[in-house]
């Protein structure tokens, strides 16, 4: 007899059937199915956070705080950052701030704060600014534009 595709088969004993536990005495692993005696660990699982009847962590610890979904987040930069990176009469935009590595993220909103001194006339375009920063820029003849 020659070996052909339709004649191929496994060697007897090479492949073993998966043992199906808990399918009756005749199957060899019926009744307790290798799980020991009856109790909580024999059954399925306990729910997440269950501590065996002890008052669980999420009920022991008090509720605290909340997350404000309407909060506006700004990346802040100061007048001192502008002083060191721009020339007199320059226009400061969010894109130029990003390219000069003042802002870390390109599409984030930015707010100008008044830390530092300004000696140059600048036109600044930003999303938000402090009143003190506005005064410092306008004292030197500059402008602030809100984007």
From Swiss-Prot:
The keyword Ribonucleoprotein applies. SUPFAM superfamilies: Ribosomal proteins L15p and L18e. Keywords: Ribonucleoprotein, Ribosomal protein, RNA-binding, rRNA-binding. Signal peptide: none annotated. One of its GO terms (molecular function) is rRNA binding. GO terms for cellular component: cytosolic large ribosomal subunit. It holds the Pfam family Ribosomal_L27A. Residues 1-46 are annotated as: Disordered. InterPro entries: Ribosomal_uL15, Ribosomal_uL15/eL18, Ribosomal_uL15/eL18_sf, Ribosomal_uL15_bac-type, Ribosomal_uL15_CS. The keyword Aminoacyl-tRNA synthetase does not apply. Residues 16-28 have a biased composition (Basic residues). GO terms for biological process: translation. Belongs to the universal ribosomal protein uL15 family. Part of the 50S ribosomal subunit. NCBIfam families: rplO_bact. Binds to the 23S rRNA. This is Large ribosomal subunit protein uL15. The gene is rplO.
